Amino acid sequence: RFYATQLSSTQLRRADGLNRQGIEAMSFATDYYSNNYPVELLSLATKPANDFQVWYEWKFCYTIIHACNDAIANLHKADMSANKLARYQCEARFLRAWAYNRLNMLYQGVPVYLEPINNEDCTRGQSSVDEVWQVILDDLTYCINNPDFPNNTLNEDYGRPSKGAAYALRGMVSVSYTHLRA
């Protein structure tokens, strides 16, 4: 659902970005539009907390994070093989790492939730940038080290997370982390 409804509605306005995904282009210096609505880059703008972009990015990423936390905590209850369970756990951790990376790049430290919660429990304070990076790296390392997580998904299950994607995201996170600490 995430891939079909969120990423597909975001497109690049011009092709001079660092990658082809419009959703990622916001992190860098590429214009983009969403459903024909041009938007300033969040990383280059000063926006109030009630701005639509700020609200939407926050909601979008935490929706992914909470869905992943729910999956990680409850997938074991489903009737499936141990290999499939391990793979789905890795996919959920990968997506959670992706969302936390997005939030950390935009907001420089955010509240970290690693277990399912209720709305009234969303009161945690901001974690430091370093703490969030560590959560991301831990999730990606878990995926990379798991033998049931496929090396790539180019032939079957195209578009699903894989070790290759986890290595790539971990590399991006490491570069960002090193750059921001310098």
What is the role of each PLM region?
Residues R1-E91, L95-Q134, P150-T153:
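Short acidic-aromatic linear motifs embedded in glycine-rich loops, typified by GG[WY][YF]DAGD(H)
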Residues Y158-L169:
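Amphipathic alpha-helical protein-interaction segments enriched in hydrophobic
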Residues T178-A182:
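Conserved small/polar residues in nucleotide/adenosyl-binding loops
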Residues N74, S176-Y177:
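Active-site catalytic microenvironments for nucleophilic, acid-base chemistry
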